[in-house]
């Protein structure tokens, strides 16, 4: 009789151990599925963020191309070269600054503020290119103050348009 009670207690402890192990594996399986689901969701969010960043880069690059487009005033230049030739001599530091502004906009700033900083950097680059052109051609830098004021009003108008 005592052997039967001991066998019954052993079987109950064994069944309890089996149930605990099954519950442990069930929880482990649920946690694995949850981890996969979270990883999948995070990957999807990361891909969406990359697409958003690429779209933002494209918009900013288009805006920079418009800003750095310099129309030349030389009358002896052919018409196809005269209209909207992109000046590629932007200083490296200005380009790095523009890229940093775009990168920082995603982390710290709103896109509107980033576009303003990018616009300022592009204006600095364009101004640099025009001064370099004038010095290389040994032309006098006449009406620099009026040109600067006109450029500032263009900058303000473009900023308001972007904002």
Curated annotation (Swiss-Prot):
Keyword Membrane: yes
Compartments reported by the entry: Membrane
Domain of life according to the entry: Eukaryota
Bilayer-spanning residue ranges: 11-31
Keywords: Membrane, Transmembrane, Transmembrane helix
Cellular compartments per GO CC: membrane
Membrane topology: Single-pass membrane protein
Further comment: Partially overlaps IZH1.
Protein name: Putative uncharacterized protein YDR491C
Organism: Saccharomyces cerevisiae (strain ATCC 204508 / S288c) (Baker's yeast)
């Amino acid at each position: 009789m005592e052997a039967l009670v001991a066998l019954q207690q052993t079987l109950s402890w064994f069944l309890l151990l089996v149930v605990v192990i099954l519950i442990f594996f069930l929880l482990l399986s649920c946690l694995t599925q949850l981890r996969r689901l979270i990883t999948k969701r995070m990957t999807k969010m990361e891909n969406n963020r990359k697409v958003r960043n690429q779209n933002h880069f494209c918009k900013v690059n288009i805006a920079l191309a418009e800003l750095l487009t310099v129309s030349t005033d030389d009358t002896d230049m052919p018409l196809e070269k005269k209209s909207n030739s992109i000046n590629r001599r932007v200083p490296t530091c200005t380009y790095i600054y523009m890229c940093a502004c775009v990168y920082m906009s995603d982390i710290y700033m709103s896109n509107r503020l980033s576009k303003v900083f990018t616009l300022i950097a592009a204006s600095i680059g364009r101004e640099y290119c025009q001064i370099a052109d004038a010095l290389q051609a040994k032309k006098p830098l006449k009406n620099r103050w009026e040109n600067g004021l006109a450029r500032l009003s263009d900058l303000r108008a473009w900023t308001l348009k972007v904002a």
